[in-house]
């Protein structure tokens, strides 16, 4: 790695990061099993992976797993606040180009996204590992602009304006870059709900130029990372940010998908009185039967002490909503992007920074709101994200998906796929021993009776866990 082919906050943090990586490895049995199973064969040899995913200690274990399987890797964080600086330093020290600093500006964020596609030999990336879809969209939007489409004229807000400027800069410096890069990609594996939705929209419009694997909807990702991970990391983030006592407080969770379910349980476990808002009648019924009061934000917002968005949608909490909130309400988001809360509408008010990623915003009438991570992912901005064990399941899916597309990509059409059931079950199986769990074995007669083999898969694809 060239001396300038990385950007981290402080290389002196590398030793600390390495110690935490070694601890995390003991909590990530799926990734360690991948190293043992595939390390000698090097199935990712020749893969040049551009990774855009929160640069945490757990991600460091993922990066080193990909490298141990033969891949070359360049990495940036997919959120301006989610990097753990000691993790980034530890990875940079090993020679992996990483561009990630906790508290990046938006200009830096999109510069770093560009740099993970800039290999020293000038050749393009051939795989993308994405979280939220920004790396994928950067290339696809740039290629459309190079083809003459008018896609860079009307930015929707500050971040798009900065993104468009970065694309124009790269087009001027390296004509044809995006088109060549798009043609070289064999496939993308996408980590999260928001990024998956973007891929399905591209597929629907016929604009997806390579196959994609939807890692998010692997059962061992969405039903574990999204639910159990949020169940632990949401309250961790709120506590580190505010030191508030949640017992007895009224909390509203906007959205009751897998992330919302984990978030509501997290707050309830801390003793909060939880209310849920939901647009989907099925999710709303689930929330009601799980014991939560299902309300509209308009009717309940004035009662809330804590408000958390988890919808994956935009403008969920508007300025009008915020005008109705209590004084000193805690407002945060655990969805991927920062547009669930209309943070831009608050910029003309008085902001007082309490500590990193905690701001006190004063309205003209004197009312104050405590905003966490500027409306971005608070569990990563104000804490350290999900625990290692649950991320092992998610990241094992990522490794298997990268192997699948790299080794068998020609067998896939330009569509969005999920990993087959037997691999989903394999990921779960790899994590049972760590928890002391023992599987019951079906007899051949029992397996035949329910129409499966004794080794599985045990459920049809349409089964809802």
From Swiss-Prot:
Binding site for NAD(+): 192-194, 226, 255-260, 278, 313, 334-336, 379
Known EC number: 3.13.2.1
Domain of life: Bacteria
Binding site for substrate: 56, 131, 191, 221, 225
Keywords assigned: Cytoplasm, Hydrolase, NAD, One-carbon metabolism
Entry GO CC: cytosol
Biological pathway: Amino-acid biosynthesis; L-homocysteine biosynthesis; L-homocysteine from S-adenosyl-L-homocysteine: step 1/1
Cofactor requirement: NAD(+)
Biological role stated in the UniProt entry: May play a key role in the regulation of the intracellular concentration of adenosylhomocysteine.
Name of the protein described by the UniProt record: Adenosylhomocysteinase
Organism the protein comes from: Chelativorans sp. (strain BNC1)
Lineage: Bacteria, Pseudomonadati, Pseudomonadota, Alphaproteobacteria, Hyphomicrobiales
């Amino acid at each position: 790695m060239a001396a300038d082919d990385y950007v981290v906050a402080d290389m002196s943090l590398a030793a600390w990061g390495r110690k935490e990586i070694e601890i995390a490895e003991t909590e990530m049995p799926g990734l360690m099993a991948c190293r043992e199973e595939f390390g000698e064969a090097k199935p990712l040899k020749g893969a040049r992976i551009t990774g855009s995913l929160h640069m945490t200690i757990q991600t460091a274990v993922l990066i080193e797993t990909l490298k141990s399987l033969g891949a070359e890797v360049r990495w940036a964080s997919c959120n301006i606040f989610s990097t753990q600086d000691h993790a980034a330093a530890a990875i940079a020290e090993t020679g992996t180009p990483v561009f990630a600093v906790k508290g990046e500006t938006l200009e830096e964020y999109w510069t770093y996204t560009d740099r993970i596609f800039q290999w020293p030999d000038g050749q393009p990336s051939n795989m993308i590992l994405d979280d939220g879809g920004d790396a994928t969209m950067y290339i696809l939007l740039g290629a459309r602009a190079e083809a003459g489409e008018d896609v860079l004229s009307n930015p929707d807000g500050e971040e798009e304006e900065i993104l468009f400027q970065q694309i124009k800069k790269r087009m001027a410096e390296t004509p044809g870059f995006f088109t060549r890069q798009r043609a070289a990609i064999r496939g993308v594996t996408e980590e999260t709900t928001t990024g998956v939705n973007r891929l399905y929209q591209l597929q629907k419009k016929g604009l997806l130029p390579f196959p994609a694997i939807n890692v998010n909807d692997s059962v061992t990702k969405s039903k574990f990372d999204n639910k159990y991970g949020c169940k632990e990391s949401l309250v961790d983030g709120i506590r580190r940010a505010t030191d508030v006592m949640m017992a007895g407080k009224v909390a509203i969770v906007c959205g009751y998908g897998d992330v919302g379910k984990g978030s509501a349980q997290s707050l309830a476990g801390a003793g909060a009185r939880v209310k849920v808002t939901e647009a989907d009648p099925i999710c709303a019924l689930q929330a009601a039967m799980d014991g939560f009061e299902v309300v509209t934000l308009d009717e309940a917002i004035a009662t809330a002490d804590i408000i958390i968005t988890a919808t994956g949608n935009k403008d969920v909490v508007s300025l009008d909503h915020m005008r109705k909130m209590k004084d000193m309400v805690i407002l945060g988001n655990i969805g991927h992007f920062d547009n669930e809360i209309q943070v831009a509408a608050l910029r003309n008010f008085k902001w007082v920074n309490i500590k990193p990623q905690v701001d006190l915003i004063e309205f003209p009438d004197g009312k104050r709101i405590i905003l966490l991570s500027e409306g971005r992912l608070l569990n990563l901005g104000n804490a350290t994200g999900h625990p290692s064990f649950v991320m092992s399941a998610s990241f094992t899916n990522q490794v298997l998906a990268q192997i699948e597309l790299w080794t068998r990509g020609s067998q896939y059409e330009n569509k969005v796929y999920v990993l087959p059931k037997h691999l989903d079950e394999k990921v779960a199986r790899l994590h049972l021993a760590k928890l002391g769990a023992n599987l019951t074995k079906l007899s051949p007669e029992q397996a035949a009776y329910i129409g499966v083999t004794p080794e599985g898969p045990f459920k049809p694809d349409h089964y809802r866990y």
